[in-house]
């Protein structure tokens, strides 16, 4: 029954919130170093690419010819306040830069304080046909419908952030199917705009200095991203032309002991 399912779902959500709430209270080790690393990488993004991608990124930045400082907007798919805590540390202890503005992160799935948004991307991802065709489960389990019903404008704000960005960085994301609308939003924006799409995934490939292997790894990362974003094969070439992979976990690589 739908009511039983939703009750079980609420229990899972509440237990997850309790667990994450406890984790969120734990101290963050070397927070000043983390804040400094984020800032350093944002200013030195070009140096994190392999040579072909570095040249491409440098040409992109030169062609944009933007005056003024760097403004960073963050769409977080996380529930915790970890990033906010690190950014606060950056503002207070890391030497501030007048030309760098990092706006407060927007949590597309909610926070521990205002509630966790959990569920699927659309009705096709609800396997049970009775649930899928009913009223209760779709309205409380399809994430875009929940945001729309809440009417706080968060989806609109995130779309504007994506469409107005010069550089879009995908970091620390699974690129899962339950958020397909956002990956397709990014793919569509990149396909029709003059944007660079930087992709940093957790890289398990063995370090190498061989040029042929580096080229293969970069191409495979682009292909992996297109597949995860559910980009139609006919559009892969367009996405490839805008995508700049960062290999070997160079971006925001934090040397923290387990």
Task: Give the positions of each predicted feature.
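Active-site periphery "cap/insert" segments of enzyme catalytic domains
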Residues: 1-110, 155, 159-164, 177-189, ...
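Short, flexible coil/linker elements and helix-boundary hinge sites characteristic
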Residues: 21-27, 39, 50, 91, ...
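Conserved active-site beta-strand-loop modules that form the wall/rim of enzyme catalytic pockets
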Residues: 104, 116, 166-169
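SIR2/sirtuin-family catalytic core signature
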Residues: 154-258
